[in-house]
Amino acid sequence: MIEADRLISAASNQPEDVVDRAIRPKLLEEYIGQPQVRSQMEIFIQAAKLRGEALDHLLIFGPPGLGKTTLANIVANEMGVNLRTTSGPVLEKAGDLAAMLTNLEPHDVLFIDEIHRLSPVVEEVLYPAMEDYQLDIMIGEGPAARSIKIDLPPFTLIGATTRAGSLTSPLRDRFGIVQRLEFYQVPDLQYIVGRSARFMGLELSDEGAFEVAKRSRGTPRIANRLLRRVRDFAEVKHDGTISLDVAAQALDMLNVDAEGFDYMDRKLLLAILDKFFGGPVGLDNLAAAIGEERETIEDVLEPYLIQQGFLQRTPRGRMATVRAWNHFGITPPEMP
């Protein structure tokens, strides 16, 4: 099953991104959740502006859908500079990165999404650019090859990744600021859902907003996606007003349960409970049992289940927790 096909996927979706961009906060004072990140960034940005310097290079990591791109936009807005956006897979050659860097104005922000997917050749170009604001490029080939240095204006590189562990140490060490985004609390998501509903002109009760937030897996992108689908249900099946009952009916119809689990989450947990008696089970066996790639399990399915206390990673494999047994109303087998 492809991650982008899941309703509760946190993967980016192009048509939705257009709407999401319009309702994203533009400044730190509008930024909801992540209190530690917000308070730290307020200080770092104010200090850089007082000194008249570019902000230190910033690495943002965490699960998808938590607002890494939003935070990059906010930083550029707060600094009053331009934001140039690209992604790791797009920068195939050193020249691609060099072209972007040489077009930056002083203190501009260059945002590289999925920075862990940069090729080694491109990454090598980044090192002197980040440290010394210089490009060191080889011209020509063979005996005639020569190195030229190009001075760059001071700039801020913001890298975003869902896999901080995949970054090389030399790249990771060149970021002066590192911020981890955590899953959102339900009250913060409720506020985000309410704000989005006002932007979309919807009648949404506080209880309805809470129900959508509760099932959004701690992720604003999922919350906004669920809100749009609940809106569709409310307009077709009811009078367009989203109450607690309407939200619950819509989300039940969409097969998103009270914990925010969809079919794939339940399939994974039930496989561990039913086929492997709660575990431990190795990742390869689990992948074969549910017909998924091991990378999909590690990067997409597991993080939220572990964070919510339904799944454990142990040296011997994956294990379901007591909370998982209770969620499905299954009695754990007696230990021998």
Curated annotation (Swiss-Prot):
Keywords, alphabetical: ATP-binding, Cytoplasm, DNA damage, DNA recombination, DNA repair, DNA-binding, Hydrolase, Nucleotide-binding
Enzyme class at the top of the EC tree: hydrolase
Reaction catalysis annotation: ATP + H2O = ADP + phosphate + H(+)
UniProt xrefs under Pfam families: AAA_lid_4, RuvB_C, RuvB_N
Entry EC no(s): 3.6.4.-
GO MF term set: ATP binding; ATP hydrolysis activity; four-way junction DNA binding; four-way junction helicase activity
Annotated compartments: Cytoplasm
Record flagged with keyword DNA-binding: yes
Residues that coordinate or bind Mg(2+): T69
Chain residues that bind DNA: R294, R313, R318
Main location: cytoplasm
Xref: InterPro entries: AAA+_ATPase, AAA_lid_4, DNA_helicase_Holl-junc_RuvB, P-loop_NTPase, RuvB-like_N, RuvB_C, WH-like_DNA-bd_sf, WH_DNA-bd_sf
Residue ranges of the region described as Large ATPase domain (RuvB-L): 4-184
Function per UniProt: The RuvA-RuvB-RuvC complex processes Holliday junction (HJ) DNA during genetic recombination and DNA repair, while the RuvA-RuvB complex plays an important role in the rescue of blocked DNA replication forks via replication fork reversal (RFR). RuvA specifically binds to HJ cruciform DNA, conferring on it an open structure. The RuvB hexamer acts as an ATP-dependent pump, pulling dsDNA into and through the RuvAB complex. RuvB forms 2 homohexamers on either side of HJ DNA bound by 1 or 2 RuvA tetramers; 4 subunits per hexamer contact DNA at a time.
SUBUNIT field: Homohexamer. Forms an RuvA(8)-RuvB(12)-Holliday junction (HJ) complex. HJ DNA is sandwiched between 2 RuvA tetramers; dsDNA enters through RuvA and exits via RuvB. An RuvB hexamer assembles on each DNA strand where it exits the tetramer. Each RuvB hexamer is contacted by two RuvA subunits (via domain III) on 2 adjacent RuvB subunits; this complex drives branch migration. In the full resolvosome a probable DNA-RuvA(4)-RuvB(12)-RuvC(2) complex forms which resolves the HJ.
NCBIfam families: PRK00080.1, ruvB
UniProt free text on domains: Has 3 domains, the large (RuvB-L) and small ATPase (RuvB-S) domains and the C-terminal head (RuvB-H) domain. The head domain binds DNA, while the ATPase domains jointly bind ATP, ADP or are empty depending on the state of the subunit in the translocation cycle. During a single DNA translocation step the structure of each domain remains the same, but their relative positions change.
Family: Belongs to the RuvB family.
Protein name (Swiss-Prot/TrEMBL): Holliday junction branch migration complex subunit RuvB
